[in-house]
Amino acid sequence: MSLQRTGEVHRVTKETNVTVRLGLDGKGKCKISTGVAFLDHMLQQLSSHGLFDLEVIAKGDTHIDDHHTNEDVGIAIGQALSESLGERQGINRFGHFSAPLDEALVQVVLDCSGRPHLSYGLNIPSQRIGSYETELVKEFFIAVVNNSGLTLHIRQLDGTNSHHIVEACFKAFARALRLATELDPRRGDAIPSSKGVLEQAGSKPKQI
């Protein structure tokens, strides 16, 4: 199977201008500039540990706060992920990984099911990491999930340092997503579902 598994999204609102290019079968090349330094750092982890080629360029109303940029980047990444997966033929579909960072340990389990759901279990001690409000971590993943059709479970197993907890989360997410989106040679071009279809909830049903 020779699929071009890439997605590109250009999203413009009165609050932000976001461009995302995502390649699932990459080598971890990344170009990230969102105007939100900590978010940039986390997206670099996503690219590096998922081996995704990822470009994210965003300009937003960060003079107000980081909320709109953070959310709209998550939306665009989710849409690019959905586009790059297409009908999700031949993928493993499921992925899980537990990532440590010093005292922090975070587990991520996900399913490229087409059924958006987030179960979020991070307990981040501080309200900010640098200038980044830590409540935005959940908002980022909500945006990704709702626009990609992922079922995503995030569990904090240990950790006291806020930076370590969030970074371990993004690393675990990257590795779990890599496992789930990789192609299974035994499956060929079949869709990994007993129904014969995987699609995002609310989309038009396909004939099979």
Swiss-Prot record:
Catalytic activity: D-erythro-1-(imidazol-4-yl)glycerol 3-phosphate = 3-(imidazol-4-yl)-2-oxopropyl phosphate + H2O
Pathway: Amino-acid biosynthesis; L-histidine biosynthesis; L-histidine from 5-phospho-alpha-D-ribose 1-diphosphate: step 6/9
CDD domains in alphabetical order: IGPD
The entry's keywords: Amino-acid biosynthesis, Cytoplasm, Histidine biosynthesis, Lyase
Listed SUPFAM superfamilies: Ribosomal protein S5 domain 2-like
EC number annotated for this UniProt entry: 4.2.1.19
GO CC terms, sorted: cytoplasm
Coiled coil region boundaries: none
Any Pfam family the entry gives: IGPD
GO annotation terms (biological process): L-histidine biosynthetic process
GO terms for MF: imidazoleglycerol-phosphate dehydratase activity
InterPro entries: IGPD_sf, ImidazoleglycerolP_deHydtase, ImidazoleglycerP_deHydtase_CS, Ribosomal_Su5_D2-typ_SF
Enzyme class: lyase
Subcellular compartments: Cytoplasm
Family: Belongs to the imidazoleglycerol-phosphate dehydratase family.
Protein name, UniProt field: Imidazoleglycerol-phosphate dehydratase
Record lineage: Bacteria, Bacillati, Cyanobacteriota, Cyanophyceae, Synechococcales
